[in-house]
Amino acid sequence: KNRENDGNRYIAARAGQLSPETSYVLHRFGMRQPTYVNNIGTRVRDMDIRKIPGISDDISMKKAWNMMAELNAVTLPIVDEEDRLDGIITINDIATSYMENQDSTIIAQAKTPYRNILETLEAEMVVGDPEAVFERGNVLISAADPDVMEDYIHQDDMVITGNRYESQLSAIESGAGCIVVCLGAPVSRSIRKLANEHGCTVIITPLDTYTVARRINQCMPVRAFMRREGLIKFLPGDYTDSIKDSMQNTRIRDFPVVDKTGHYIGMISRRNLLGAKGKHIIL
């Protein structure tokens, strides 16, 4: 059959023990016994496995959201440096993080990399280390007079401010760990020098205060909200009949496929299960 060159590859197989007559004929013509196959059911490898790229656990929530929009996906796999599956994050996880987390310390609790903040706020760091992490302090907006704000700013806080010299000076002297200057306002040399002496990071963003306040939570790394425990994942050799219940009894829509060593291969969905193509058999 393979000599027909029709683009398919055919493999001889048997479903049980060979009869003595069949064994004799195969031996007589120098043919190997066909491979024993006890189940010809459809497997995960027969499904349309979608090659959604894995992401690092330190990318921002905003970047993950944008990737979902670009890929038309609702779930992203999170992998380590060796491409082993570490977890997943869904579009619902991201939406929930926006709606339910109102704690002003959540940015620090998530150990947010400054490079995420710079990317999300379209910002430039003029004092500080872009590879550092914001891991202590609250986030607050300097909306009152400096004399009033001094009572609210604590050590290592992130202060969102404008172009007022006095507000920037007050934040640094009050122990702020970072000030975010909005509307692209220039920061004077004296403020930069003072910030450097106090170990205060200075970031300039072209965005307005309202937009910065909206986006700041989107800077957090996905690891803060990713799902690690109880992941439903499948192997390429799993039979589709055996995975149906697992796929149907959860709200998750997409499921990762990994090899035996845990390396990520791709994603499958319930829709892929319905469209899975069975093996073609010639009797």
Where are these regions (language model features)?
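Short, ordered loop/turn segments at secondary-structure junctions
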Residues: 15-18, 41, 81, 91-94, ...
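Bateman/CBS regulatory modules and CBS-like beta-alpha motifs in cytosolic regions of diverse proteins
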Residues: 35-67, 79, 114-127, 131-165, ...
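Short hydrophobic alpha-helical runs that function as membrane-insertion/retention elements
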Residues: 11, 34-36, 76-77, 158-161, ...
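A short, polar/charged loop-to-alpha-helix boundary motif
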Residues: 91-107, 213, 271-283
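A glycine-centered beta-loop-beta connector
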Residues: 47, 68, 76-94, 247, ...
